[in-house]
Design a protein with these regions (language model features):
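Intrinsically disordered, low-complexity Ser/Thr/Pro/Gly-rich regulatory segments
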Residues: 1-259
Length: 259
């Protein structure tokens, strides 16, 4: 692997990579979630609160239609989103009444996806990168073991999507929210630690940073990190945009920047 030279190696994956036959279901579900992002936030909160009451192995969920968050606020799941999860095969036996909601996760892997707010953007980017057939290799949720040579234990040892493009590592961080300086810094450190100069960093974030040329966007640019935002994610051409961003990323101009 390209990581070995710097004393880091791929330890494996934090999330199971989806089977190819599930790609279509996942992308259809992404459409629903990304188009209703605020409802997905509350629904995701609800699912997490309720799932926490049951063991990790438990596939069946039953609850009152309202759950109470730590801050005392009540959350109710969005019916449209729950029905979509059932339609695309992530949950089954969905029953919603005025007071209660119950369903089964279709499999342990489906449960991992449904209870995770941000994983859908990672899956979305991963599937589009795979489908483009433009790259040598694509990994989802690559866990990187810094301990190989390094005494300092990095907290951020997971990179959402890693792509090998003609043996150049491309690190992609996915945030289902606006980009922020912390996200840029984190990606920059990871990129520098593993890839050095000969690597690329891309932040895919669900904000308006690229359109509005925000401070975060400008900071990222300064460090040679590309940002794709909600407009790109919601575009029918996301796959082409992703490939173009990776292939055309200008490495030469980065070399002389002081980091």
């Amino acid at each position: 692997h390209f990581m070995d030279a710097r004393g880091a190696c791929l330890m494996g994956h934090s999330h199971k990579e989806p089977l190819e036959e599930r790609y279509e279901d996942i992308l259809n579900m992404c459409d629903v979630l990304f188009d209703n992002i605020n409802n997905w936030k509350t629904t995701s909160n609800f699912i997490q609160i309720v799932s926490a009451r049951f063991s990790t192995q438990e596939m069946r969920i039953k609850s009152r239609i309202q759950a109470i968050q730590k801050n005392g606020k009540k959350v109710t799941p969005d019916k449209k989103i729950l029905y979509a999860f059932q339609k695309f095969g992530f949950i089954r036996d969905l029953k919603i009444t005025q007071e209660n909601v119950s369903f089964c996760f279709s499999s342990p892997m489906d449960k991992q996806y449904v209870i995770n707010y941000g994983i859908w953007l990672e899956l979305f980017v991963y599937i589009h990168a795979k489908r483009s057939e433009a790259f040598d290799d694509v990994w989802l949720g690559a866990l990187i073991d810094w301990n190989a040579y390094d005494a300092s234990r990095m907290a951020g040892n997971e990179i959402d999507v890693v792509i090998s493009d003609q043996s150049m590592p491309v690190f992609i961080s996915c945030k289902l929210r606006s980009a922020d300086t912390a996200a840029v810094n984190e990606l920059m450190i990871e990129k520098k630690r593993i890839g050095g100069w000969f690597s690329k960093g891309i932040l895919v974030a669900f904000g308006r940073d690229k359109q509005e040329k925000t401070a975060t966007y400008l900071r990222a640019k300064e460090f040679g990190i590309e940002i794709l935002d909600a407009k790109d994610i919601l575009s029918a051409r996301f796959e082409q945009i992703l490939v173009k961003t990776i292939k055309e990323h200008d490495l030469i101009s980065l070399k002389w920047k002081k980091v």
